[in-house]
């Protein structure tokens, strides 16, 4: 292709993504767009086609982002090239969203006609506005009996401030309004900027590991072009690789001769290790490099940490390999080796949130077949010591001696909760119970309220989301961003089994709740740990002070069964002998802690 043809082709490219709250019909809309543009034959079509992980389809959520090229013949007779970049809607995966938005010029905002705007819709819209995207509102599910498109139209204008007069009324499920959406993309989404003949500049927005071809980069070409045989260079570390294949996804990978400015596709270049490629890095040509890199993504810091241990200790290396492979595709997962007296060798992993943690655990068990024990999640605390140091600690077992601690700061989040009027009471009560600090409350319309709180992240990590859903019958929607660190009155609670500390059961708790939490956990463990041949005391301690105790009674054999009648001293002798044996057992006996016991520390209910 000569330069003129390339520029003409670039004018026909439209890059867009779909943003929406969970369950507002984003993946279904993507399916309809694929059908309408005949990208996928009827035979291959299946629901949630872009959600390729089993886990995504089961949970009905989108986790990874996917990029696809479609051809659309518009009403003006021209054929346009669409690149649809599918994004997740869940709050834990905003990182994935920000990555896909960086590769687009436009975004379709899907809002449910019955539910209206929800907290994550807002969060994602602000991300899109930060990236200067053209936003096309679509009001979906208009065939629902409860749909009220006009109210939603008004809401989009009032709450987000977008002009919704031309918002498409659609039903992705019934296929209504799909063509209008496609025409709007052609008219309103701008063609990509960028010079076809400038030096190559491409943004890596995802990477996938393939056992045969090495790391495959998903890129959005900003300037220039790349073809097979080019030698590419990664700008962050200067490493060079030879391109073996370039192509696009139509969901399946299809190889092409070249990718040019505006294209979204993949590059394989025999890259061996995942560590060489960073999502957000810039790819350029070694022979004619670009002068400066593109603005990369901001690094996402993991907010929630937990220990992951293989149940069979010889699987440690398998677990490391599995984590490395997951990290290839999941830039936000962090891990480092750690050891625990109770659980042996494992890893301390950092996650964006609880759903992220859940998904990683399930993928490890499913895709790699490793049985795991997860410890209670914790957050990163800042500890100011008496000698003027500040420590960052994410693992309760690394807490310094209480006498060295001046004060402890914990991360707070700014939580935005949208909820129908009737449930304001329960939500505020829940937030207060989770040590929330009330900020503001705005009425969005006659019956929906937006409440903003500062809440400690450690309280959200436990079960805030589940509690919120159950106290509002599922109507609340919730989004949070990290705000700052604040001093809190926190203490570390240890659990002793048979007078031995089990490091994996330690956790950090606010002093006001320490006594109740200790009591609940001790009772829970009593139910979960099987009875032994000897009595096992379970104690919850803060420092050297025991705040709660419960005993697991010993199993015992009736040693008097063979004594008929018999003298009392004979019986006493047998009982004393049994007692001495139990005592000896207790001195050397160790207690097996089942997996449920570790999880019980998680599901701390205020029962």
From Swiss-Prot:
This is Elongation factor 4. Residues 11-193 form the tr-type G domain. InterPro entries: EF-4, EFG_II, EFG_III/V, EFG_V-like, EFTu-like_2, G_TR_CS, LepA_C_sf, LepA_CTD. Belongs to the TRAFAC class translation factor GTPase superfamily. Classic translation factor GTPase family. LepA subfamily. Its EC number is 3.6.5.n1. Signal peptide: none annotated. It is a peripheral membrane protein. SMART domains: EFG_C. GO terms for biological process: positive regulation of translation. GTP binds at residues 23-28, 140-143. The keyword Nucleotide-binding applies. It catalyses: GTP + H2O = GDP + phosphate + H(+). NCBIfam families: lepA, small_GTP. The gene is lepA. CDD domains: EF4_II (cd03699), EF4_III (cd16260), LepA (cd01890), lepA_C (cd03709). Keywords: Cell membrane, GTP-binding, Hydrolase, Membrane, Nucleotide-binding, Protein biosynthesis. It holds the Pfam family GTP_EFTU_D2. Its main location: membrane. It comes from Lactococcus lactis subsp. cremoris (strain MG1363). It is an enzyme of class 3 (hydrolase).
């Amino acid at each position: 292709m000569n330069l003129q043809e390339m520029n003409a082709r670039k004018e026909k490219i439209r890059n867009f993504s779909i943003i929406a709250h969970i369950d507002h019909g984003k993946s279904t809309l993507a399916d309809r767009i694929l059908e309408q543009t005949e990208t996928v034959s009827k035979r291959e079509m299946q629901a949630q086609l872009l959600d390729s992980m089993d886990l995504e389809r089961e949970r009905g959520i989108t986790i990874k982002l996917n990029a696809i090229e479609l051809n659309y013949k518009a009403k003006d007779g021209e054929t346009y090239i669409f690149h649809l970049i599918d994004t997740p809607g869940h709050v834990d995966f905003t990182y994935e969203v920000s990555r896909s938005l960086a590769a687009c010029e436009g975004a379709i905002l899907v809002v449910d006609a019955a539910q209206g705007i929800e907290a994550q819709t807002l969060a994602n819209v602000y991300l899109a506005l930060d990236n200067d995207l053209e936003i096309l509102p679509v009001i979906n599910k208009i065939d629902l009996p409860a749909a009220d498109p006009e109210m939603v139209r008004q809401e989009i204008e009032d709450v987000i401030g977008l002009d919704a007069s031309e918002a498409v009324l659609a039903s992705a499920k019934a296929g209504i309004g799909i063509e209008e959406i496609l025409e709007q993309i052609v008219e309103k989404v701008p063609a990509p900027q960028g010079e076809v003949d400038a030096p190559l500049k491409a943004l890596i927005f995802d990477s996938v590991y393939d056992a045969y071809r090495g790391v495959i980069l998903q890129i959005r070409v900003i300037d220039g072009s790349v073809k097979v045989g080019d030698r590419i260079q990664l700008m962050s570390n200067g490493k060079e690789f030879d391109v073996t294949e370039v192509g696009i996804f139509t969901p399946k990978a299809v190889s092409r001769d070249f990718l040019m400015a505006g294209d979204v596709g993949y590059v394989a270049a025999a890259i061996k290790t995942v560590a060489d490629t960073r999502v957000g890095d810039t790819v350029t040509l070694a022979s004619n490099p670009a002068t400066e890199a593109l603005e990369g993504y901001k690094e996402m810091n993991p907010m929630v940490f937990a220990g992951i241990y293989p149940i069979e200790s010889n699987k440690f290396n398998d677990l490391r390999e599995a984590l490395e492979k997951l990290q290839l595709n999941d830039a936000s997962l962090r891990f480092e080796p750690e050891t625990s007296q109770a659980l042996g060798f494992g890893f301390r992993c950092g996650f964006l949130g609880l759903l992220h943690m859940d998904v990683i655990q399930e993928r490890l068990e499913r895709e790699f077949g490793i049985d795991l024990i997860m410890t209670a999640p914790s957050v990163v605390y800042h500890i100011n010591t008496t000698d003027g140091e500040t420590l960052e600690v994410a693992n309760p077992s690394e807490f310094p001696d209480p006498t060295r601690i001046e004060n402890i700061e914990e991360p707070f989040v700014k939580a935005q909760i949208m909820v129908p009027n009737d449930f304001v009471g329960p939500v505020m009560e829940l937030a207060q119970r989770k040590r929330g600090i009330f900020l503001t409350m705005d009425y969005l319309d006659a019956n929906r309220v937006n409440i903003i709180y500062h809440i400690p992240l450690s309280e959200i990590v436990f079960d805030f989301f589940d509690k919120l859903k159950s106290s509002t019958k599922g109507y609340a929607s919730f989004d949070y961003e990290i705000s700052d660190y604040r001093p809190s009155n926190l203490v570390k609670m240890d659990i002793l089994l048979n007078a031995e500390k089990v490091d994996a059961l330690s956790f950090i708790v606010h002093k006001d709740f320490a006594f109740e939490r200790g009591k609940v956990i001790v009772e829970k463990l009593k139910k979960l740990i099987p009875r032994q041949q000897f009595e096992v005391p379970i104690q919850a301690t803060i420092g050297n002070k025991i705040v709660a105790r419960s005993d697991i009674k010993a199993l015992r054999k009736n040693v008097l069964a063979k004594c008929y009648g018999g003298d009392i001293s004979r019986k006493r002798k047998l009982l004393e002998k049994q007692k001495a044996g139990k005592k000896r057992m207790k001195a050397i006996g160790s207690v097996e802690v089942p997996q449920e016991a570790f999880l019980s520390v998680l599901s701390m209910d205020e029962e």
